[in-house]
Structure formats: structure tokens, C-alpha cells
Regions:
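Ligand-binding pockets and gating/stacking loops
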Residues: 1-170
Length: 170
């Protein structure tokens, strides 16, 4: 393909330069371009989850087949780890509960609990948890007192900068 031909031409130029000026950074640059190409070329295979068995989708929950859901992203994280990607970050938005805490917290924690639990189970069943570290964390916690109008269905909590959660598995 065109990308491969351009990369090969670039490799040839760098190799010629290295013959004249044998600097480590030139060889390093060649290796980095190759690694970037391999990573980009593997994206379609990694993101195609059509070959995942049904029991994996069942493990991760009802949103597992929905692209962009936390459950689908957890499956994608496992698939990236299988391809030896060294650092994978998942992000789950919507946790700034200054209001509607009872409804929002229940929904979001269900998504995260199911997805994270399934990811750890999946990694363990594949023997990958032995050399994979899962780190989950938030940048701040919540105060213990309510914020906003206090009703049974609509209240929130303010930020607590000295209280946060981090857990690890692996």
C-alpha cells in the first residue's frame, strides 16, 4: 500500500544518512516509524469485535455491543492488551454530581462496576492478569454533606480534594 511504500522510502533515506552519520537517534527513528506503522495497521483488526464470542459480550453486559460504551471500551482495552499495547487509558465521563446524585450515581456505577469486573475476570481467565496491572482512580472524592436542594431524588455533593479512590488489580 501507499503508506508502506512511503515508509520504505523513508527507511532508505534514513539508512543512507546512518551510513554517513551513524547516530543512534537515526536508527531509533527508523524503529519508531516501523512501530507506528504496525500500530496503525493493526487498528482495524483490534477494533473489529465481530469475532468475539457471545459469552464475552454477556460477561461485559447489555451495552457491550454498543460502540463507545464503557463495556465495549473495556473489551477493546483487553484486545489492545492482547496486542501488547503497554498503556491503555479508559475514561468514563459524567461523574460531576452536584445534583441528581441518586439517579446518576446508580446508573454510572452500574456501568463501571460491570465493565471493570468483567475486564478483570476476562484478563484473569486468559492468564493476562499475571503481567497486566489495572489501575482505577478518580482525581477527587465527594464531601459527606449534601449540596443543592435536598429532596429524595435530587441532591448532590461538592468536590473533596483530599478524598479520592484508587484501586489496582493484577
Amino acid at each position: 500500500n501507499d503508506t508502506r511504500r512511503m515508509l520504505d522510502a523513508l527507511r532508505e533515506l534514513h539508512t543512507r544518512r546512518f551510513a554517513v552519520q551513524p547516530e543512534a537517534y537515526i536508527q531509533s527513528r527508523i524503529e519508531q516509524y516501523e512501530m507506528a506503522f504496525r500500530m496503525q495497521a493493526s487498528v482495524p483488526d483490534v477494533t473489529d469485535m465481530s469475532g468475539e464470542p457471545e459469552h464475552i459480550f454477556d460477561l461485559y453486559g447489555p451495552d457491550a455491543k454498543k460502540p463507545g460504551s464503557f463495556a465495549a471500551n473495556c473489551i477493546l482495552a483487553r484486545r489492545l492488551a492482547e496486542q501488547n499495547v503497554k498503556f491503555i487509558q479508559l475514561y468514563h465521563p459524567g461523574w460531576d454530581h452536584h445534583g441528581a446524585l441518586p439517579r446518576e450515581f446508580t446508573a454510572l456505577s452500574g456501568e463501571v462496576d460491570r465493565g471493570c469486573g468483567a475486564l478483570i475476570t476476562d484478563l484473569k481467565q486468559r492468564g493476562m492478569l499475571d503481567d497486566t496491572l489495572v489501575v482505577w482512580g478518580g482525581e477527587f472524592g465527594r464531601t459527606s454533606y449534601s449540596q443543592g436542594k435536598l429532596t429524595a431524588t435530587n441532591y448532590g455533593r461538592d468536590h473533596h480534594p483530599r478524598c479520592f479512590t484508587v484501586w489496582m488489580a493484577g
